[in-house]
């Protein structure tokens, strides 16, 4: 197929427990700076990491993502890992996506802190044939890797989902850290309350 007719789609994977403005800003900046057709936020079913963390149901995480991105036409959702179930390995996901969408070039967005772990990723050499890695540079990060990585400069917000869950557990509303409609959903559904 003619390279000019190919779609350029970014993927930002994560637990999104909950989604917040740092995730959204990263996805939107990559979409604009790389001139992508869309960036899809891709919630993982079960993270493959050793430090498995407790997460809320996929239903709630997907609903929060839908609320967070509904006003931005550059962002969308990719639910393949939720639908597939089991552990979420990037290689398995990208193999399925590239087979299902042969006219699409995928750009996998990672934080600069993940670049040093690329050698440990499952089937990294095969994954590199399927995707282009995009990393957002932090001031304190050395921008080099033995793997091909496209580095972008974008402001990064020091917000973490862990911090937000702790705030909700203490009954502190994290106004301005995540979209208000997501805060309202979390409060209505009583998510992240101490048991």
UniProtKB/Swiss-Prot annotation:
EC number(s) from the headed UniProt entry: 2.7.7.18
SUPFAM superfamilies in the record: Nucleotidylyl transferase (SSF52374)
UniProt record, GO biological process: NAD biosynthetic process
Superkingdom assignment: Bacteria
Database matches in Pfam families: CTP_transf_like
Group of enzyme by EC: transferase
A GO term for molecular function: ATP binding
Function text: Catalyzes the reversible adenylation of nicotinate mononucleotide (NaMN) to nicotinic acid adenine dinucleotide (NaAD).
Protein name, as recorded: Probable nicotinate-nucleotide adenylyltransferase
Lineage, broadest ranks: Bacteria, Bacillati, Bacillota, Bacilli, Lactobacillales
